[in-house]
Amino acid sequence: MSIATEIIGVPETLDHFQSESFSPYHFFSSEQWAKFRADTPLTLTSDEVKRLRSMGDPIDLDEVRRIYLSLSRLLSAHVESSQLLFEQRNRFLSLSDVTKTPFVIGIAGSVAVGKSTTARILKELLGRWPSSPKVDLITTDGFLHPNAVLQREKLMQRKGFPESYDTAAILRFLSAIKAGRPDVQAPCYSHLVYDVLPDEYKIVDRPDILIFEGINVLQSRDLPADGKIVPMVSDFFDFSIYIDAAEDQIHNWYVTRFMRLRETAFRDPNSYFHRYASISDAEALEIAADLWTNINLKNLRQNILPTRPRADLILKKGKDHLIEQVALRKL
């Protein structure tokens, strides 16, 4: 099924609905998208890309050339337009000595789909623009409720679902960022101990660009019955990206990553998942499949995939973890 059909949600037999004129997106193959790079310089080395990519993600310098340089150029245009609008509004309001608030980029997608790699690659590319902007990266992991809270509320098996996050804290953080406040605290998370680290924070001090990455960042909220105003996390985004792939592919990537972690991080006695390091491969495969089916697949279908049409840009991956198609929202 084509990305156009999936986004619109109609059968492929309805060819007239696949026309771009009936879609809010422009669609490009990776080869077409690569041509939009123009003269954007390649500022990363092969070794740097290897350092930035997540376990199991084969992204290389060629993929950066094909996909990310064009994306960097596009984001540069959006940031420049935002700066121009900021200046025009200040003139309209007769304001002076006003500091522009950060340009916020949201990145969403399933677990194991490659969000973190995309976020880290973009952080480096954007920070190396000629204007040398200050770029920060924050993930939503730190905004999960602590395990003690999840255990008390019987939500440990729902970790990663919307109710497992402190959404109010996310909104306070993004509101402070968009208000232009200095030294905003973002809670830290440890994948080793699988928990929020108490009293540990990353300080975000008025960056030019903030990348905010997590599975839940494009999700909407139920409107309260009392009529109170409820902001959405995505209300604070200037641009949003969804990393997409077929379910069976993400399943394979998730299981492969789980098995590799058994040979690496899980062997650390301090790891929350240390118990999985000593079981048989067959047992590990069964556990990984169960975790995928009963937790991550459900979350993908119920809460993550439905947010895809809300993204400004959709990067669709193929079975080799490399991006095959790009959808860009029309203006």
Curated annotation (Swiss-Prot):
Q: Which residues bind ATP?
A: 109-116
> Which is one Gene Ontology cellular component term of this protein?
cytoplasm
Q: Where on the tree of life does the source sit, at the highest rank?
A: Bacteria
The EC number of this protein is 2.7.1.33
Biological process terms from the Gene Ontology for this record are: coenzyme A biosynthetic process
Q: Which UniProt keywords apply?
A: ATP-binding, Coenzyme A biosynthesis, Cytoplasm, Kinase, Nucleotide-binding, Transferase
Q: Which reaction does it catalyse?
A: (R)-pantothenate + ATP = (R)-4'-phosphopantothenate + ADP + H(+)
| Pfam families according to UniProt | PRK
The record, for CDD domains, names: PanK
GO molecular function per UniProt: ATP binding; pantothenate kinase activity
Q: In which pathway does it act?
A: Cofactor biosynthesis; coenzyme A biosynthesis; CoA from (R)-pantothenate: step 1/5
Q: Where does this polypeptide localize? A: Cytoplasm
Family membership, please give it: Belongs to the prokaryotic pantothenate kinase family.
State the protein's name: Pantothenate kinase
Organism of origin: Rhizobium etli (strain CIAT 652)
The primary gene name is coaA
